[in-house]
Amino acid sequence: MFPKQEYFVGNIMDYYIQKGMVDEGLAQINKLLATSETPYYLYVKGILLYEKKQYDDAVAIFNKIISNNGDLVAEAYSKIGDCYFFPAQIIVEENAKLAIDDPKYNENENKIKELYEKAKPYYEKAKELKPDNKALWGNYLLNIYWKLNRAEYDSLEKELGY
């Protein structure tokens, strides 16, 4: 029997992720969701989908948490931001290997900005809901503001005490 306590579910799902057994984790969390659709179980499912890089499906799950307006709303906003931010980081790393005059460089820069623009309101909402939980939004917004709006970057840098 699979445990139902959130603590155990979270630890088991972390194990599945570390071992590359995300599909097994999804199968288990779907069974739990069939009996009890809690914000925590939904959040875990969203994380598993995120780990599989099924970002649209993950966003749909996180939006369900937000629309239910219960627990983990700020965290769900942050994870939606992650669904745009981290794919952008892959492109940032790719661009670091390209010459600035490479046509692909500008194309990538535009993609990065587009993904950052999508991520930004979700991190800002997480900040609004949980201003003291900087792990949800702090460094992500700093990176985004650095790329998109230096004035916001300077202001946030001061706020974070850097």
What positions do the PLM features span?
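Generic helix N-cap/helix-start motif at coil->alpha-helix transitions
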Residues: M1-N11, T35-V44, L72-A76, N133-W137
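Structural register within alpha-helical repeat arrays
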Residues: N11-Y16, K45, I80, P87, ...
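Residue at a conserved register position within TPR or TPR-like alpha-solenoid repeats
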Residues: Y16, L49, Y84, I91, ...
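TPR-repeat structural position
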Residues: V22, Y55, Y116, R150-A151
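Short coil/linker segments at helix-helix boundaries
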Residues: F86-Y122
